[in-house]
Amino acid sequence: MSSKFMKSAAVLGTATLASLLLVACGSKTADKPADSGSSEVKELTVYVDEGYKSYIEEVAKAYEKEAGVKVTLKTGDALGGLDKLSLDNQSGNVPDVMMAPYDRVGSLGSDGQLSEVKLSDGAKTDDTTKSLVTAANGKVYGAPAVIESLVMYYNKDLVKDAPKTFADLENLAKDSKYAFAGEDGKTTAFLADWTNFYYTYGLLAGNGAYVFGQNGKDAKDIGLANDGSIVGINYAKSWYEKWPKGMQDTEGAGNLIQTQFQEGKTAAIIDGPWKAQAFKDAKVNYGVATIPTLPNGKEYAAFGGGKAWVIPQAVKNLEASQKFVDFLVATEQQKVLYDKTNEIPANTEARSYAEGKNDELTTAVIKQFKNTQPLPNISQMSAVWDPAKNMLFDAVSGQKDAKTAANDAVTLIKETIKQKFGE
């Protein structure tokens, strides 16, 4: 699976802002109903990232046998396909079904680029995944396909058991074997890219912070400067005081973390499922577990993410596309998705099937996902990433105290939303 597509929510940041502005600048597609008749449909086109090719090829055979409809597969840059969806809808040159990260679903739907999707009983959704495909207007624009969450990787050659609490991690930091060469008093026992807001949000939210109110749908209610956020930021700063200076590099910290872990100099890190293959290739004897509980005893409430099946607005036959989406999110096809891609199914029955395979990464993601908060999928989220990154850097580097950094970030977020969205 393309790591670029898998970790889209984690790394889009300003890229998300640019793509959303591209969509916003395009003319909204006329809100006309697609043809609902499907009796004459003999072929459907699905557009996906190259990593889903073998999965679609297998389930397409079953669908052709069941429905008598041929499924034509097109592969390419899935994110790029979403970026030009506004133009493709205007020309009518769109696939019948495609895939989108959850954080793109609500904004594209609200902007008129996606058709509404009905969630069938066979989809077996839960509250979190349903929220991830529901826009601020209350309409559903995608069918949940995959779930993702940050997890903890740990080196089994360095620690016998997975750390359970942040107190455990603090104790590891006292061990001299994790001392960072060249910087006295600095440790790499535990590392996390906490100037990246996607990675840090679980720390802040676990202390009571939130991005937007009403489950991420109310952009007028911003909770990144409340008391819980300040507690979380200050806790992050306490770690930066222990970490090498390079951890403050907002562009290079991720590479530093990966290198230290792969070289056996770091016992535990927080990262996403997309990093597992790199650790396998580096022959790290690693384990995967849920992220340790915070000092306040609460869970690390990371963003819940993943991908959904969506239907472009300009499809010629909405009913036929909907039927294929229903087929894709049903339990049996979701089981095949896991077997072919090792990505965690959104369907709760298929998720249980995946958990039964006793794979550490799968189990950790499923357990961690239960404690996640939906990544806001409204367009205004594009105004959050850069100010939040600056907030974290300013605080952990000591350029501002946590309260000032948070207040400044919220002020900038509000100003940006007002400028770009008129709110």
From Swiss-Prot:
InterPro entries: Maltose/Cyclodextrin-bd, SBP, SBP_1_CS. Keywords: Cell membrane, Lipoprotein, Membrane, Palmitate, Signal, Sugar transport, Transport. GO terms for cellular component: ATP-binding cassette (ABC) transporter complex, substrate-binding subunit-containing; plasma membrane. It is a lipid-anchor. CDD domains: PBP2_CMBP. A lipid is attached at residue 25 (S-diacylglycerol cysteine). GO terms for molecular function: maltodextrin transmembrane transporter activity; maltoheptaose binding. SUPFAM superfamilies: Periplasmic binding protein-like II. Induction: By maltose. Its main location: membrane. The keyword Transport applies. One of its GO terms (biological process) is maltose transport. A lipid is attached at residue 25 (N-palmitoyl cysteine). It is found in: Cell membrane. Residues 1-24 form the signal peptide. Disruption phenotype: Grows readily on glucose and maltotriose, but is not able to grow on glycogen. Deletion mutant is still able to depolymerize glycogen to some extent resulting in alpha-glucooligosaccharides increasing in size from maltotetraose to maltooctaose and larger oligosaccharides. Substrate binds at residues 52, 77, 83, 103-104, 148, 193, 196, 251-254, 274, 307. Belongs to the bacterial solute-binding protein 1 family. Part of an ABC transporter complex involved in the uptake of maltodextrins. Binds glycogen-derived linear maltooligosaccharides increasing in size from maltotriose to maltooctaose with the highest affinity for maltotriose. Has a very weak affinity for maltose. Has also a very low affinity for maltotetraitol, indicating that the binding is selective for maltooligosaccharides with an intact reducing end. This is Maltooligosaccharide ABC transporter solute-binding lipoprotein. It comes from Streptococcus pneumoniae serotype 4 (strain ATCC BAA-334 / TIGR4). The lineage of its organism: Bacteria, Bacillati, Bacillota, Bacilli, Lactobacillales. The gene is malX.
